Amino acid sequence: MLMKNHFKTLVTLVACMSVVPAFAQMMGGPRGGMGMGGPPALDFGGSMGKLFGNNPDFTADIEMQMPGRSGGETMTVPGKIAVADGKSRFEMDMANMKGGNMPAEAASQMKAMGMDQMVTISLPKEKTTYMVYPGLQAYAPVTMRNPEAAKPESDFKIETTELGKETVDGHPCVKNKAVVTDDQGNKHESTIWNATDLHNFPVKIETQEQGRTMTMLFKDVKLTKPDASLFEPPSGYKKYDSQMALMQDTMMKQMGRGGMMMHPPQQ
């Protein structure tokens, strides 16, 4: 029974850790550029950054929606986002996720491991993402694999075509088709709803990924520059060499609580 519980914990951990990369594919430059080999972070550099026009710095509540495969239940992931100078910070709580194929006990098990809350800090110029876990007071760096990450804004051009006018979350919007082209001729197409009362901020973005429409909704948008400290890992947290090392140490602690030998973390 003990080993069965540990196996369920491991399965839950892997399932939860794979959630954000699925959404990151819609935001990380070339489609699939982030994939499973990239960090589970939201990248607002590259082609994605062009969609925000003259609004490079902001904070907002964000909700990401992704339909399940073969007509499965839509997964919804809410969180908070802060963006400045191409850097981004995304905060999420596993307890607030809905739908998808997440195990029913996922939230409680992640909370027991101290991994229910997760913060990703994406630094495109450094090609690094920090995975931060407040419940563990720990973090780990991950190398960004998005080839667009460090490209200057001048390498991208955007063309928009008006599709109509709609209201989104109380904001009057112009619905546009947006096509971003990089210096290699690669094109990324999205549908965006630019709020005319928010300096044309895109309060809704839709893009296609593997035949599915992925959606981002932004609420409580503030067009002010976030504090620079938000884009740095907490100084008092333990730093691991890799996310794998962090996960392994967390699993060993969990197994130790169940009566198995617990290995102390490497300093």
Regions found by a protein language model. Give the residues of each.
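N-terminal acidic, proline/glycine-rich, low-complexity intrinsically disordered segments
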Residues: L2, Q25-M26
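Bacterial N-terminal signal peptides that target proteins for export
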Residues: L2-V11
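Sec/Tat signal peptide C-region and signal peptidase I cleavage site
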Residues: V20-A24
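Extended soluble regions of mature proteins
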Residues: M26-Q267
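Hydrophobic helical h-region of N-terminal Sec-dependent signal peptides
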Residues: T12-C16
